[in-house]
Amino acid sequence: AAGILGFFIVNYPFGLIFLGDAGAYTIGFVLSWFGIAILINVPDVSPWAILLTLFWPVADTLLAIYRRSCRKQNVCAPDRLHIHQITMRGLEICFFGQNRRHITNPLTTLVMSPFVIAPPIVGVLFWDQNLNAFLAVLAFFMFLSVAYVYSPRIIRRFRR
């Protein structure tokens, strides 16, 4: 976690170092095994609380698979419909205009940070409360779904 935080601090806001898919997959793999190890060694921990700590990458991946399956596309094919990309395009369309990625990219991180940080915090708070952690997973997934569906409509309404 300290290494990831260090990477974020050194790399923000200009993104001079690219983590890439290999780095992201490695971090996800390690964090997933940490979660499994915790569940094996501390049976009082709710699996839903562990899922909350990894909520955004898991939920974003599941949403991408669902979206591509509904469109009869390859689930492994890339697209630009992830919530962070929609947020960045919304900032460009509504406030900053095109060719301003040096502003909208770090600003997207700031805008999304509270939403990305909230599920892990709730997961820590509900670490031993299985029902509450499960309800929190449902609530955050519903929030993500609503944000995903309504963000383009809001962006169109506030277009400059």
Positions of PLM-derived features:
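Alpha-helical transmembrane segments
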Residues: A1-R160
